[in-house]
Amino acid sequence: EIGSGLVGSEMCIRDRYIPAMRKSELQLAFKVQRGKKTYDLPRVTVAEGVISTAEIANAQELNPAITPDKFQRIIEEKYSADIMFLIQQANLRSEQLKSEQMNALHNEIKAATEAPNKELTNINVASYASPDGGVKLNTTLAENREKNTVNYMKKSLKKGKIDADMTAEFTAQDWEGFKELVSKSNIQDKELILNVLSMYSDPEQREREIKNMSSVFKVLAEEILPQLRYSRITASVNVIGKSDEEISKLAKEDAKALSVDELLYAATLVKTNKEKAAIYAKVVEIYPNDYRGYNNLGMVQYEEGDLAAAQNNFAKAARIAPNTPEVAMNQGLISLANNDYAKAEQAFGKSAGVEELNEALGVFYMKKGDYNAAVKAFGDVKSNNAALAQILTKDYSKAKATLAGVEAPNANTYYLMAVLGARTNNEQMVVSNLKKSISMDSSKAQQAATDLEFAKFDIASLVK
């Protein structure tokens, strides 16, 4: 028996649903009091059993969130050096070509061509003229600086027997560079100079206005403008990491030879959860201070139904990285699976931006009985839980399409399809899908035998 009472004019059942209620009777008992005597009248059965379709909502079918690796097979590195020019000159000075910057650049270019895991992809020359001197003069000047720098680099590469693609461009008046340098300077009237730049877009007008500011132009000529007369040479180098085959082999034979990101990446190359768990266990062993190993090991354990082990590893991840949304969401899944909705809600509130969050919220809302909110949270997700929310809001056509789109149908998928058949009075749909469901999970026979969704259909032969 369960407790009940009146709230206003409505009956309130005080006990929560338990599976035994599927096969039960709801009876009304009456007591009549006349004077000092009380009479018990015969009980009246008003309903049999409980339709518990909402209880099919399954937190363990949700996808926990992975904390991804940052592995990049190809990493682009850039090395630069500047060649400075004197005012209104484009010739390359010897001291500039022998500077520490240039020597370092040549060494990096040479190293890139000799290293087996590096590739020199491009050398770019960008030449500039300062904004004083007029557009026509500076165009010729910047163009000549580009030409001379390119010729120098071509000769240098040829001498070193280095083959590389080369690109080049020039900027006649480097107003952007001028603005940046002035902004970072300690020049007394720099705000006045910046205002001129914002007020006038014509380069000739800008130059005239700034030259009229005699109090600051001398400082500009000495401190700012010389820095804008240069060619910048940039070498782009690809550093090529280990192949998938190399990473997979090392993950099995010598995991310590891999970085944490390479080892995390190795787990994405295997197919089974057993293989993934073995790799994540190595991450935890070799890199115990990286929360991702614990989280991802817990993720695999959750998918395998080992909630206690998953909870333990999620907790370890949270201790190392307490503000990580993915870890918080996974802890929310544990709370949801344990019917601790207050903790689940708190955890999901810390999980903004996690891709898997909306589906988790969908199940949370279903567990709370807010089916419309669940449908909204699921959006266009194709899952059993999403279809269940649509069934509970009586959107049967959409639920059917959702179930048809489930990537890996399981016993629950076909059971829900049978429920849809019952809701739409399609006996063939009920029978065929129950057969499939029971063939995948024999416990579905017992579930169907007491499910009032199928009360009007002859399924006795299926559930023996």
Protein language model features and the residues they cover:
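Periplasmic OmpA-like peptidoglycan-binding domain that tethers envelope proteins to the cell wall
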Residues: 130-234
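Terminal, low-structured helical/coil segments at or just beyond the last alpha-helical repeat
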Residues: 435, 439-464
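Periplasmic peptidoglycan-binding/anchoring modules of Gram-negative envelope and division proteins
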Residues: 65-67, 85, 90-126, 154, ...
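Canonical tetratricopeptide repeat
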Residues: 296, 330, 360, 385, ...
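Register position in tetratricopeptide repeats
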Residues: 303-304, 337-338, 367, 392-393, ...
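Residue-level recognition of tetratricopeptide repeat
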Residues: 268, 299, 333, 363, ...
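Single conserved hydrophobic/aromatic residue that forms the stacking wall/gate
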Residues: 2-8, 13
